[in-house]
Amino acid sequence: MLVLPAAAGASVDPGSALHAYMRGRLADGDGAPGLALNSYREALAGDPASLEVARRSYFQAVISGDMALALRSAAVLESDGLLPRDGTLLQIAGALNRKDWPGARLLVDRMVAEGNFAFLAPITRSWISVGEGRYAPPVIDPADRFASLARRYLDEHLAFQALRNGDLPNAQSAINRALALRTGEMDALRLIFAGQLAARGAKAEALALLPEKEANFAQARADIASGKALSLHGKALTAGQGFARLLTRLASDISSDGSTGTLGIRLARIAAFVDPDGPTAHIVAADLLSRAGHAAYAIEEARMVPAPGWYGALAQAELVEALAAAGKRAEAIGLARALAAVPDAEPERHVRLGQLLAQEKDFEGAASAFRTAQAGYPADAVPWALLLFEGSALEQGAHWNEARAVLERAARLAPNEPTVLNYLGYAQIERRQNMDAAVELLKKASALKPQDSSITDSLGWAQFVTGDIDAAVPMLERAAAGAPADATINEHLGDALWAAGRRYEARYAWRAAAVFAEGETAQRLAAKTREGMKPEYAAR
């Protein structure tokens, strides 16, 4: 059994399990997941009974996509009752891969007893029955405390199972219900349903799922119209693929909350274990890995989906994000340009390009991309967010007059959107223009979103620069309480406190701001903390 050395100076055999484990821990801390994975694999082989090695190996293996190591680690943890709840899902995936239907059913029973993922049981059992060759539709007990949660996932699987059984009328009804309930991954779901319908002769119904003049669907529409590649995209889902669809959807759903992002990655990885050729799990995993800081793995996952295929555009979009997260910004921008240049490119492609260009300080290019994204909308129905993006790029690119016109248009279209009101109001305050109207915009924004520290700061700073110090100080104190690590807010508070005669507190606020400030701002804060407030030291 692996144990820590008795003394800090004790030598460790470079070939030992302990050495491999320590190397893995160091690699974990240094952000070298590949080395960490190899080290934990070696450590577990050298000491297969070590719970600590198994625990770290399990998490690293699932995140990294090594199913064999994940299953070995899970077996060690299970023997001591330490297997994480998602480990049961992993073991179900393993049983489905082996076509061990009785074993899969026993594991589902355990999943129900454990509680966390019990709501997945009716649909999972139904897919197991598909594998057994004696199909039984999912049955959700209305008295079950998880019934409402399980029903969120039901229609999608009823549709796939009806398609498998050739029951097109019931499949179409379930498809319509499933699409009506979904808010994410809509394009991928439309594609898989369209492929299934087209392969069963429902060509018109398949095409109806794929909007015209959208690049994401161009290849699929062309193939369906010509009858090409339908056997590939219309294969009936297996038990494992059905389970993978369930986990992929759950991974996407729970990962809107950053606190559950790592669990979402593990679920998407398990889905890919049981359906390695399915594109959706790889696309979702790429997205979640990128957002969680695992850019190298995200790139690998996105590239698992063939670029020329039906799902290629969706995977390439995630590849852009992963490349940017990995610091490969030139490559990301090049790919984003290529995706935005195709016929009928969706607005999202232009927005993605614009955001990357803005991050590289190419504000004119960014504004142009955001403007192009608006082209497909009627003039009075352009989404306010696209106008805000364009206005922000123009403002940062020193084209204030054009920016103001765009931002004012956004405010007319979205008069109760606090983000728009805040940007337009604060930009005018910064330039000391239209001050009274700008303060009113910020008051309205703050009333609409009183808990937003950034908006509270904007209003407090506007009150300060217009001379209402008595109103400004408590407003800025509230902003700083809500965002204590924000350098701009703390500097604003310090300036206002100084003007109110509260010099000690002002210096305290400036010191708090200096902790997070850089460059010119850090120099300015140091100067006024040392010398006191002077006109040339005023916050920008």
Residue positions per predicted region:
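N-terminal leader/linker segments that initiate helical-solenoid repeat arrays
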Residues: 3-57, 62-72, 82-83, 106, ...
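Generic helix N-cap/helix-start motif at coil->alpha-helix transitions
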Residues: 12-20, 31-32, 47-54, 81-89, ...
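Residue-level recognition of tetratricopeptide repeat
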Residues: 25, 59, 93, 127, ...
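Repeat-based scaffolding regions
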Residues: 28-32, 51-52, 169, 224-225, ...
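Alpha-helical repeat scaffolds
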Residues: 67-79, 101-113, 134-148, 168-180, ...
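Alpha-helical adaptor scaffolds
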Residues: 127, 248, 320-321, 423-481
